C-alpha cells in the first residue's frame, strides 16, 4: 500500500527530515512513479536492515502504520546529504501554526529562537560559575571555618545531593506546566540562597544554604535542554546543544577566575559568592520573556498528552541506550566533579614543591586552571558535536563510540598530570588541558542521545532521571570521597613518615581502585565508612605540604579507573542505540496518531 492510499488522518506529517532529504519530498508529493523506480525502491528496501531508520537525525520521525508503507518510508528517510532542500531554508510542517517554522541553518534561525537560546546559555553559564566559585577559594574557606578535606568536599556533596533529589520533581513539573515560570522561580531561589549563605559565620548554616542552592539549580538544569529540543531538530539541534553545553567548562573556569580574583580584590572570600546572585536576578527577568514552545513542536507533533509518571519511569528503565549512556555520563560527572573541586588545590600543592616555587600564590594557580578549563571547553564541546555530526552519517553508532573514546583517552592523560605536577608545571598544564578536552567531548553528545531515544513527552522526566543517577553516583560523592580518602592517607603518612614512597603508592592506588569500583556498583557507602571515621578525627590536625600533596594525589587516581569504567558503558550503549532510536520514532508516531483520532472525534462531536 502506498502513502497516497492511506486515510488522511493517518497520513504521516512531513517533518524536518525532508529538509535534508529531497527524495522524501518528491516521493510524497508526486502522484505516482515509474515502474522501474518502484522496483529500485523495493530492491533497496530489501537490502535495508530492519532498523533502517535515519540514524543521523536526533529527532523522531513520523512513519506510516502499515507494513508496506513502513518499508517505503524507511527507504525515503535514508539520508541524502549532498542535496539541498527544494523548498528553501525553512520547511513548514502541516498541522502546526504557520509561525512554527523549523530552521535548517544558522542564518534561518529566528530572533525569538536566538533570544531563547542566548538566555538559556547565559543562565547555564552563571549556574556553573556559582557552582565552582567556592573551588577557587577553597583554601580560604577551609582556613576560615577550620575544616579538613572531608568537610571541604562535603560542601559540594550537600549541594549536589539536594540538586539530584529535587531534579525528578522539577522533571515531572517540566513535562506538564509552564517551563519558563518553573525556571524563573528556581533561578531566583538559588540566587537568593547564594547571597544569604555568604553572610553565614557558622559552618553548619553555611553548608545548609549551599544545599538550598542545589534545589534552585535543579529547576533550571532539568528543563532547559528540553526547550532547545522543542525548537530545533537534526544537526541544528546538535549545534544549539553544543552552544548550551559550552557553559559547563566555560562557566566552571569563570567560577575559578571570578572567585579567586574577587576574593583577592576584596580581601575576603565571601565577596566571591556575591557576584553570581546579581547576574541571577537579571536572568530571572530574561527567562520570563522567553516563550515556552509546544512539546514535540519541532518534530511535527503537537498537543501530545503526557502519560503517567509511573509509565514514564517504566519506559525509561527499559530503554537500554538511555540507561547505559546515563551510567557512562555518571562516570563523566564523577571525574568532572572531583577534578573541578580538588584540581586547583592539588596543583597548588604540587607546584609549591618544585624548587623556586615556594612562594607561589594559589590565586594564580586557580586563575591558570580556570583558563585551561575554559579553553578545553571551548574546543572540546564543539569538537564532540562536530565529530558526531560528521561520523554519524556513515556510522550510526558513532555517538556513544565518541564518548567512549573521550573517556579512554582522558584517563591516561589525567593520570600523567597527577604524576608530573610536582616536577614540571608546563607539562602538567598541557596534560590537564588535553585530558579535559577529551572529557568534554561527552557533554553535547550525551544530551543529544537522550533527546533522540526518548519521546518528547518524557524528556524532562528523562533529564531529571539522568541528573538523579549521574549525581547520586557521580559528582555528589566524588568531592567528598576524594577528600575522605586523602584524609585517611594523610593520617597514615603522618603516623608513618617512612611509608612515603613506592610501597605506599601501590597500596594507596589499590585502595583508590577499590573505592572507585565500589562507587560505580553502588556499594560506596560501605567502602568509605572506615575512611570517614578515620578522617573525622583528623580534621583539625596539621599536615605537611608533602603529606597533603600525596594524600590528594593518590585519591585523585580514582578518577582514571572511573573513566575506564565509563568508556565500557558507552561501548555497550553502541550495541543498542539504533534499536532504541527506532523505538522512540515509533512511539512518537503512535502517540501522534492517537492524538489525531481524538482531535477528529472532537471535531465531529
Swiss-Prot record:
GO MF, one annotated term: transmembrane transporter activity
Bilayer topology: Multi-pass membrane protein
Tell me any Pfam family this protein matches.
MFS_1
| Organism of provenance | Drosophila melanogaster
What keyword terms does UniProt attach to this protein? Developmental protein, Differentiation, Endosome, Glycoprotein, Lipid transport, Lysosome, Membrane, Oogenesis, Transmembrane, Transmembrane helix, Transport
**Its Gene Ontology biological processes?**
cellular response to starvation; courtship behavior; endocytosis; endosome to lysosome transport; glial cell differentiation; glial cell migration; larval central nervous system remodeling; lipid transport
Query: Record keywords: Membrane included?
Result: yes
Q: Could you tell me what this protein is called?
A: Protein spinster
Amino acid at each position: 500500500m502506498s502513502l497516497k492510499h492511506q486515510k488522511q488522518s493517518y497520513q504521516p506529517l512531513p517533518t524536518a527530515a525532508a529538509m535534508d532529504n529531497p527524495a522524501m519530498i518528491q516521493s510524497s508529493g508526486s502522484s505516482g512513479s515509474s515502474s522501474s523506480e518502484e522496483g529500485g525502491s523495493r530492491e533497496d528496501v530489501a537490502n535495508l536492515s530492519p532498523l533502517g531508520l535515519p540514524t543521523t537525525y536526533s529527532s523522531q520521525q513520523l512513519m506510516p502504520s502499515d507494513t508496506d508503507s513502513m518499508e517505503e518510508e524507511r527507504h525515503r528517510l535514508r539520508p541524502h546529504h549532498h542535496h539541498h532542500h527544494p523548498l528553501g531554508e525553512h520547511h513548514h510542517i502541516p498541522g502546526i501554526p504557520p509561525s512554527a517554522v523549523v530552521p535548517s541553518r544558522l542564518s534561518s534561525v529566528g530572533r525569538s529562537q536566538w533570544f531563547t537560546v542566548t538566555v538559556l546559555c547565559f543562565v547555564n553559564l552563571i549556574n556553573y560559575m556559582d557552582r565552582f566559585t567556592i573551588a577557587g577559594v577553597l583554601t580560604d574557606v577551609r582556613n576560615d571555618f577550620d575544616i579538613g578535606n572531608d568537610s571541604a568536599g562535603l560542601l559540594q556533596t550537600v549541594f549536589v545531593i539536594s540538586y539530584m533529589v529535587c531534579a525528578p520533581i522539577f522533571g515531572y513539573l517540566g513535562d506538564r506546566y509552564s517551563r519558563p515560570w518553573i525556571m524563573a522561580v528556581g533561578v531566583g531561589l538559588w540566587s537568593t540562597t547564594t547571597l544569604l549563605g555568604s553572610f553565614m559565620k557558622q559552618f553548619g548554616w553555611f553548608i545548609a544554604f549551599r544545599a538550598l542552592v542545589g534545589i534552585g539549580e535543579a529547576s533550571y538544569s532539568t528543563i532547559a535542554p528540553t526547550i532547545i529540543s522543542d525548537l530545533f531538530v537534526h544537526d541544528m539541534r546538535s549545534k544549539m546543544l553544543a552552544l548550551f553545553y559550552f557553559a559547563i567548562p566555560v562557566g566552571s573556569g569563570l567560577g575559578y577566575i571570578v572567585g579567586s580574583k574577587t576574593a583577592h580584590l576584596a580581601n575576603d572570600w565571601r565577596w566571591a559568592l556575591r557576584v553570581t546572585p546579581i547576574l541571577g536576578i537579571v536572568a530571572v527577568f530574561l527567562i520570563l520573556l522567553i516563550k515556552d514552545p509546544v512539546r514535540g513542536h519541532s518534530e511535527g507533533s503537537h498537543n501530545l498528552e503526557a502519560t503517567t509518571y509511573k509509565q514514564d519511569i517504566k519506559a525509561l528503565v527499559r530503554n537500554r541506550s538511555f540507561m547505559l549512556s546515563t551510567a557512562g555520563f555518571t562516570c563523566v560527572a564523577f571525574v568532572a566533579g572531583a577534578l573541578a573541586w580538588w584540581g586547583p588545590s592539588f596543583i597548588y600543592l604540587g607546584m609549591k614543591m618544585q624548587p623556586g616555587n615556594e612562594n607561589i600564590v594559589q590565586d594564580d594557580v586557580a586563575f591558570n586552571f580556570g583558563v585551561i578549563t575554559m579553553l578545553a571547553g571551548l574546543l572540546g564541546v564543539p569538537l564532540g558535536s562536530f565529530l558526531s555530526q560528521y561520523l554519524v552519517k556513515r556510522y550510526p553508532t558513532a555517538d556513544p563510540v565518541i564518548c567512549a573514546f573521550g573517556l579512554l583517552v582522558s584517563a591516561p592523560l589525567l593520570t600523567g598530570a597527577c604524576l608530573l605536577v610536582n616536577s614540571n608545571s608546563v607539562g602538567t598544564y598541557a596534560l590537564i588541558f588535553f585530558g579535559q578536552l577529551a572529557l568534554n567531548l561527552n557533554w553535547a553528545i550525551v544530551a543529544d542521545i537522550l533527546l533522540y531515544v526518548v519521546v518528547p513527552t518524557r524528556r524532562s522526566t528523562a533529564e531529571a532521571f539522568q541528573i538523579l543517577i549521574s549525581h547520586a553516583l557521580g559528582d555528589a560523592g566524588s568531592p567528598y570521597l576524594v577528600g575522605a580518602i586523602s584524609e585517611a592517607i594523610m593520617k597514615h603518612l603522618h603516623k608513618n613518615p617512612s611509608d612515603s614512597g613506592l610501597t605506599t603508592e601501590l597500596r594507596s592506588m589499590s585502595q583508590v581502585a577499590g573505592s572507585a569500583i565500589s562507587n560505580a556498583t553502588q556499594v560506596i557507602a560501605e567502602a568509605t565508612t572506615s575512611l570517614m571515621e578515620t578522617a573525622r578525627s583528623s580534621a583539625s590536625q596539621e599536615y605537611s605540604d608533602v603529606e597533603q600533596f600525596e594524600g590528594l594525589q593518590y585519591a585523585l587516581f580514582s578518577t582514571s579507573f572511573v573513566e575506564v569504567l565509563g568508556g565500557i558503558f558507552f561501548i555497550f550503549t553502541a550495541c543498542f542505540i539504533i534499536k532504541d532510536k527506532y523505538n522512540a520514532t515509533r512511539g512518537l508516531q503512535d502517540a501522534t496518531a492517537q492524538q489525531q483520532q481524538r482531535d477528529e472525534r472532537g471535531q465531529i462531536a
